[in-house]
Amino acid sequence: MTWKLFICFLSFGVIFLRVSSLTEKSHTTSYTILHNNNFYSNSCSADTYVPSIKTFSSVWAILNVIIFFCASLFYLRHLCIVKFISNLTK
């Protein structure tokens, strides 16, 4: 059991190092900042926003949403089963 845990932590470490090296490279490259002057206008809406999956924070946020959604489903499933069993045993 411990060697499986070791391999799991090792693989997460390798993935983390790859992600951190990708983000470090992006800091050294030059880029231009595009300012959107229409951000506060009425024409700006959520339809014009394009999410990016290239950053670690975006991937982390998506992963957190998926985990929260699955946990909510499991909790609601548990509540339904408990209520069903309590109704059966009355």
UniProtKB/Swiss-Prot annotation:
Chain ranges passing through the membrane: 56-76
Signal peptide (from-to): 1-21
Keyword vocabulary terms for this entry: Disulfide bond, Host Golgi apparatus, Host membrane, Membrane, Signal, Transmembrane, Transmembrane helix, Viral envelope protein, Virion
Domain of life according to the entry: Viruses
Virion surface domain ranges by topology: 22-55
Membrane topology recorded in Swiss-Prot or TrEMBL: Single-pass type I membrane protein
Subcellular location: Virion membrane; Host membrane; Host Golgi apparatus, Host trans-Golgi network
A cellular-component GO term for this protein: viral envelope
Intravirion side: 77-90
Entry keyword Transmembrane: yes
Family statement drawn from the similarity comment of this UniProt entry: Belongs to the herpesviridae glycoprotein N family.
Chain's role: Envelope glycoprotein necessary for proper maturation of gM and modulation of its membrane fusion activity. Also plays a critical role in virion morphogenesis.
Assembly description: Interacts (via N-terminus) with gM (via N-terminus). The gM-gN heterodimer forms the gCII complex.
Protein name, entry field: Envelope glycoprotein N
Species annotation: Saimiriine herpesvirus 2 (strain 11) (SaHV-2)
